[in-house]
Amino acid sequence: MQRKIKSYVLRAGRISNRQQQGLDLWLEDYELKFDSPTPWNFAKEFGRHDADTIVEIGFGMGTSLFAMAMNNPQCNYLGIEVHKAGVGSLVADLHEHQISNVRVVVHDAVEVLQTKIPENSLAGVQIFFPDPWHKKRHHKRRLIQSEFIQMLVKKIRPSGFIHCATDWEDYAEHILNVLSSESALFNQQKEGGYSPRPDSRPLTKFEQRGERLGHGVWDLVFIKNKEVTNDKACNSY
C-alpha cells in the first residue's frame, strides 16, 4: 500500500508544562522506536507472552486509551499518535498512575502498520474520532479507505476486531460502506448498521457535551472471520 496523502496536518500547538515534562522525562519508558530495523515482537516489547495487543490509531490526548489500559491490565495497548501534546499528556498520566501495559509510537500510522506490525498479531484496532475532512475536496485525506482497511485485516488475527467511532454522520456512512465491502469482515451489529457504544469504549467529556447538545456519535464494530471463536478476554465483542 502506497499512501502519499497524509490524513493529518502537523501544526505547531501549545504544549503545557506537564506535557513537556512527559515528553522529556518519561516518553523513553513507553516509546517504541519506528527506526528499529525489524518488525516489533510484542511479547518482547511488553515483557509478557500471554497478552493480546490492541492498537489505537490517533489517540488524541489519550483519555480513552488511558482508561481502557487501566481497566484491562490483561491487555497490551499500542497507541499511535503524531501530535506531541497528546503524547506528552498520555505519557504523564501513565507515569503518574504507574500503568505498564501501554506503549507509544510517534509516527505516521500507515507507515507503522506497513513495516512494524506483524500479520495476524493484533487482537484489534480502534480508531476513535478520526479527522472527518468534511469538505468534499478533502475526502481523499480520510484515513479510512478501502486500501487501508485491507491492510488492517492482514494485521489482525482471525476473530480480531476493528472498532471505529465518529461524530460526523457523513464519515460514519463512508466508514460503514468501506468496512461492509471487505469480505473478510463481519458487522457485529446483526442488522448491518451501527453498533451501540460498547461499554469498553469510555465516554469522553467531548461526547458528553455533544450528547447534551443533541449531537450524534456512530460506533462501528466489525470482526474478522466471525466464525472463528475466540475466548481471549481482550476481545469483548
Curated annotation (Swiss-Prot):
Disulfide bonds: none annotated. Its EC number is 2.1.1.33. Substrate binds at K135, D167, T204, K205, F206, E207. It comes from Legionella pneumophila (strain Paris). Keywords: Methyltransferase, S-adenosyl-L-methionine, Transferase, tRNA processing. NCBIfam families: tRNA (guanosine(46)-N7)-methyltransferase TrmB. Signal peptide: none annotated. Catalyzes the formation of N(7)-methylguanine at position 46 (m7G46) in tRNA. Gene3D superfamilies: Vaccinia Virus protein VP39. This is tRNA (guanine-N(7)-)-methyltransferase. The gene is trmB. Belongs to the class I-like SAM-binding methyltransferase superfamily. TrmB family. GO terms for molecular function: tRNA (guanine(46)-N7)-methyltransferase activity. Pathway: tRNA modification; N(7)-methylguanine-tRNA biosynthesis. The active site is at D131. GO terms for cellular component: tRNA methyltransferase complex. S-adenosyl-L-methionine binds at E56, E81, D108, D131. It catalyses: guanosine(46) in tRNA + S-adenosyl-L-methionine = N(7)-methylguanosine(46) in tRNA + S-adenosyl-L-homocysteine.
